[in-house]
A protein has these predicted regions:
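Gly/Trp-centered helix-boundary motif
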Residues: 1-281, 430, 434, 439-463, ...
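Alpha-helical transmembrane segments of integral membrane proteins
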Residues: 184, 195, 226-236, 252-495
């Protein structure tokens, strides 16, 4: 039994998914949009980046499904004087808010150590005073409570790790072969009616022949790049899955928490910052940019003065001041947030709003310049001559011709917003300290890097996860820009 919990950021993420679903349906009904997205998928790097982003998004969505677990009857006192108390106690729920990802990663969360331990280690990273059975005290590296605890002989460590990695690689190879063949079977019917599934003599191409065509790179969509990326992901994930039950793959932090768990939990924060901030930024940029470019005159002067003044203020200083003011309000009114999760979620949502309000100026300038050009086109002048209202002209004729700029800017700003959260959390004005994020991991690693011996794996883990998240977002953004920018296409072909 559990009680579903929808936090503010959860509701906005679900709303964003609904918008994406609506956009997908619109793309299916629009031939020009289908052609543009087909140009995106023809890019091998974009297809591989989309697969990596999908894995990150899946982890983030699993961490967005929150609930409160039910308390067991033994943990709730039942009084005999209250009729139906047993049934009432069965309906009580814990104050702890968990997610589906927490349930899946419960073995990692329950296997905490006392303090630091290196990746795949069997002993602690620092010496401790240990009392021997004869009463003597010595300084040595103690055995971990969970990491490598199954090993009877420490000499078997290398063999055990290699066997687990080998089993994971074999399982990855088998699973990759099955998924690849299923993908080929699923894709071949979509090619029916075209020329790519026909032999030179006109006969129908078999599944094996279509698979050979895919691996030769002769298919319209570069499925070979997708399958190779899928193979690398499986070869990385499954061996780690084999090691996780017995080892801390990425080590532990100061309080003994598994660093792999912290890194996976930090993905939701990065994705929420990158997506929800865009939802806040777009209305300001769209409305003010179109108004400035369409109406011109004093409206243009006023909007230019507004975003020029806002852009002249140092961004980090403005965000830090707003976050600190909000933090004072949160701490002085604890009754607003019954649980720690609600307080941390509200601070994350507030950070998204603050970043969105302070980062719309660049897109607004682009939309203003494009609107200044669009308002002089003949179809806009004709609409004005026939008496069509200004707002209807902007909605029907200006806005659709700005969407390629909006889409390109949104995708390209995602990586910058992810890095902005890390910087703000590093300086102490980011998300709540109780919330996992790459910024808090980097902030904690600041002192760990200066100790002796140096603890390097927390910073390295945050760097690797952020690197692949931002790299895949940038590669996908480049493909979207190349596909949707009309200046790069002349007569339906790339210039």
């Amino acid at each position: 039994m559990f009680l579903p919990v929808i936090l503010w950021t959860d509701a906005l993420v679900f709303a964003l998914l609904a918008v994406l679903l609506g956009a997908l349906l619109r793309v299916r009904r629009s031939a020009p949009l289908r052609a543009s997205w087909r140009r995106v998928w023809r890019n091998p790097a974009a297809l591989s980046a989309a697969l990596v982003l999908s894995v990150f998004l899946l982890i983030g969505l699993l961490d967005t499904l929150h609930f409160r677990p039910a308390l067991s009857a033994a943990s709730v006192p039942v009084t005999a004087s209250a009729p139906g108390a047993a049934s009432a106690s069965a309906a009580r729920y814990s104050s702890e808010v968990r997610s589906v990802l927490d349930v899946l990663l419960a073995p990692l969360a329950s296997r905490s150590e006392r303090t630091y331990s290196a990746p795949l280690a069997t002993h602690a990273y620092a010496r401790e005073t240990i009392e021997l059975p004869d009463g003597r005290q010595v300084r040595e590296f103690p055995r971990l409570r969970h990491g490598g605890a199954h090993l009877v002989q420490l000499d078997d460590w290398a063999e055990d790790v290699m066997l687990r990695v080998l089993r994971g690689l074999v399982l990855a190879l088998v699973l990759w072969f099955v998924l690849s063949w299923m993908l080929v079977i699923a894709l071949r019917p979509q090619a029916e009616g075209g020329t790519q599934d026909r032999m030179h003599d006109g006969s129908r191409m078999s599944a094996a022949e279509f698979s050979a065509q895919v691996w030769r790179g002769q298919s319209e969509i570069p499925w070979r790049s997708l399958l190779i990326t899928l193979g690398f992901l499986l070869a990385l994930i499954l061996p780690i899955g084999m090691l996780v039950p017995q080892y801390h793959v990425l080590g532990t932090d100061k309080v003994g928490q598994d660093v792999l768990l912290l890194s996976l939990k930090s993905l939701r924060t990065a994705l929420v910052i990158g997506t929800l901030t865009t939802l806040v930024m777009l209305p300001f940029a769209l409305l003010l940019g179109m108004m400035a470019g369409y109406f011109r005159g004093w409206v243009d002067d006023l909007i230019q003065y507004l975003y020029t003044s806002l852009h002249s203020i140092p961004g980090v200083l403005l965000v830090a001041a707003a976050v600190l003011v909000l933090q004072v309000q949160i701490e002085t009114r604890p009754e607003w947030f019954p649980t720690t999760a609600q307080r941390a979620d509200f601070r994350l949502l507030a950070l998204c709003f603050i970043l969105g309000i302070t980062s719309w100026t660049g897109l607004c300038r682009l939309l203003r310049g494009e609107t200044l050009k669009l308002r002089e086109f003949d179809y806009v002048q004709a609409a004005r001559a026939f008496g069509v209202g200004h707002w209807r002209i902007m909605r029907r004729h200006i806005l659709p011709n700005l969407m390629h700029i909006v889409l390109i800017a949104v995708v390209m700003d995602f990586s910058g917003l992810v890095l902005a959260e890390a910087v703000l959390s590093y300086v102490g004005v980011g998300v709540d300290p109780s919330m996992n994020s790459f910024g808090t991991m980097i902030n904690a690693a600041r002192l760990e890097m200066g100790r002796e011996p140096m603890v390097w794996w927390s910073l390295s883990s945050a760097f690797v996860f952020m690197f692949f998240l931002v790299l895949s977002a940038n590669l996908f953004a480049d493909a979207v820009r190349d596909a949707f920018d009309p200046r790069l296409h002349i007569g339906g072909r790339s210039a």
